[in-house]
C-alpha cells in the first residue's frame, strides 16, 4: 500500500486506507506461525501527530472488541525511545542497533537467559546486557511507567523525542476511551527495521501463547523509499488465522446455521420444476430452503431431508399443484397438514418459531 500511496499525489491527506490479502513470509512453520496467511491492514498517511497512532490503536481495540475478544491488551512502546537508550550505551552502528533491537523483540519469546546469551554473542559487556534487559523489562500502567521514565531518562535528543511521542499517544488514546486497554511495555519494538516511532502489539490476555493477534506502528521513512516524497505514516496489520485460533479457543465463533430449514419433496418428476420455484420463493423470504437436485424417489428424498435435520418438509405432487396447496410435515413431531401455497411462508414461520 505504501508504494501506491507514495505515488498518488492526487489523494487528499490524511489518507486512510485498508486492504486484505494473502501474505508469504520466510519463517519456520510452528504453532500460530505460518509461511502463508491472510492479512488485513489499516493505515493512515500524512499525519505526524500522535493522534494518528492513537486512532490506529483505538481501531485495533475496536476490532478485537467486535469479535468478542474483550479481554485484550495493547502493549505499546516507541522505537526512538529504545534506540535512543541503546545509543546512550555507545552503540552507534545502525546494523548493530537493528540486530540488538531484533534480540529485544524476542525477549518475550525466548526468555531473558537466552536473550542474555545472544547479547553477549553480539559483543556486549555484562553491564550493558544487564542494563538493556532491565530497560526492556519496564512495563505497566502508562501513567506510572511514563512518570518513572520522565525522572530517569538519560540525556539524548532521540530518546526524549521517543518519550514525547509515546506520551502524546497515551494522552490521545485516553481521549478515545481506550486507555484501560493499553499498557506500556518497552520490550515491544517490532522486529522489522522500517518501524521508527510508536509501536504496539495486541494480545488476548487469556491466550498469549498464540502470540500477537495484531501489531503495527509508525513508519515515517517508508514512503520516501518507494516514492518521491516524505510522508508520515502509521498502521496496523493482523493475521486472520491467529484471530480465528483465538476465537476458536474461546468458543466465540457465531452459531451460524448452515443446514436448510425447509426441504421441498416431490412425489414424482412432473412437479420438480414447481418444487424449484417454491424453494426459490421461500429463499426470497429469508427461509433456508432446499430441494433434491438428484431427483430421487420420494422415500430417498425424505431420508436425505431427515439426515439434514430440517425442521419441515413440504411434500408436493400433481394434486397439490392443481389445488394450489402443499403438504407440510413437521419433522420433529411427524404431524402433517395441507396448507395453501399462498400462506405457506406464514405457516412455516409459525412452525419454526
Map each language-model feature to its residues.
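Positively charged, Gly/Ser-enriched RNA/tRNA-binding surfaces
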Residues: 3-70, 118-353
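Short, conserved phosphate-binding/catalytic loop or strand-edge motifs used
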Residues: 34-40, 76-84
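Internal, well-ordered alpha-helical segments in soluble enzyme and binding-protein domains
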Residues: 56, 78-81, 99-100, 165
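Hydrophobic mid-domain F-helix/FG-region of cytochrome P450s
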Residues: 59-65, 80-89
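Phosphate-rich ligand and nucleic-acid binding surfaces
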Residues: 84-91, 109, 126
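Acidic, His- and aromatic-enriched active-site or binding-groove loops in soluble protein domains
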Residues: 91-112, 204-206
Amino acid at each position: 500500500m505504501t508504494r501506491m500511496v507514495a505515488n498518488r499525489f492526487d489523494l487528499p491527506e490524511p489518507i486512510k486506507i485498508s486492504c486484505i490479502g494473502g501474505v508469504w513470509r520466510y519463517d519456520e512453520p510452528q504453532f500460530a506461525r505460518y509461511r502463508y496467511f491472510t492479512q488485513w491492514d489499516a493505515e493512515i498517511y500524512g499525519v505526524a501527530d500522535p493522534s494518528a497512532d492513537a486512532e490506529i490503536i483505538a481501531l485495533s481495540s475496536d476490532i478485537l472488541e467486535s469479535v468478542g475478544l474483550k479481554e485484550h491488551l495493547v502493549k505499546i512502546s516507541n522505537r526512538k525511545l529504545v534506540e535512543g537508550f541503546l545509543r546512550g550505551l555507545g552503540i552507534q552502528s545502525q546494523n548493530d542497533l537493528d540486530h540488538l533491537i531484533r534480540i529485544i523483540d524476542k525477549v518475550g519469546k525466548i526468555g531473558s537467559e537466552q536473550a542474555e546469551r545472544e547479547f553477549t554473542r553480539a559483543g556486549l559487556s555484562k553491564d550493558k546486557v544487564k542494563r538493556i534487559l532491565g530497560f526492556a523489562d519496564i512495563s505497566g500502567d502508562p501513567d506510572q511507567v511514563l512518570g518513572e521514565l520522565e525522572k530517569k531518562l538519560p540525556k539524548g535528543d532521540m530518546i526524549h523525542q521517543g518519550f514525547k511521542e509515546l506520551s502524546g499517544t497515551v494522552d490521545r488514546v485516553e481521549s478515545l476511551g481506550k486507555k484501560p486497554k493499553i499498557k506500556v511495555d518497552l520490550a515491544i519494538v517490532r522486529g522489522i527495521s522500517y518501524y521508527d516511532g510508536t509501536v504496539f502489539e495486541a494480545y488476548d490476555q487469556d491466550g498469549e501463547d498464540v502470540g500477537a493477534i495484531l501489531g503495527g506502528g509508525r513508519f515515517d521513512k517508508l514512503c520516501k523509499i518507494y516514492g518521491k516524497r516524505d510522508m508520515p505514516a502509521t498502521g496496523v496489520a493482523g493475521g486472520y488465522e491467529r484471530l480465528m485460533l483465538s476465537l476458536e479457543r474461546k468458543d466465540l465463533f457465531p452459531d451460524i446455521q448452515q443446514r436448510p430449514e425447509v426441504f421441498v419433496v416431490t412425489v414424482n418428476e412432473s412437479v420438480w420444476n414447481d418444487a424449484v420455484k417454491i424453494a426459490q420463493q421461500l429463499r426470497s423470504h429469508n427461509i433456508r430452503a432446499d430441494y433434491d437436485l438428484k431427483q430421487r424417489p420420494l422415500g430417498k428424498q425424505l431420508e436425505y431431508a431427515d439426515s439434514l435435520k430440517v425442521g419441515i418438509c413440504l411434500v408436493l405432487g400433481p394434486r397439490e399443484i392443481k389445488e394450489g396447496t402443499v403438504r407440510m410435515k413437521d419433522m420433529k413431531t411427524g404431524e402433517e397438514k395441507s396448507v395453501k401455497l399462498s400462506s405457506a411462508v406464514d405457516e412455516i414461520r409459525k412452525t419454526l418459531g
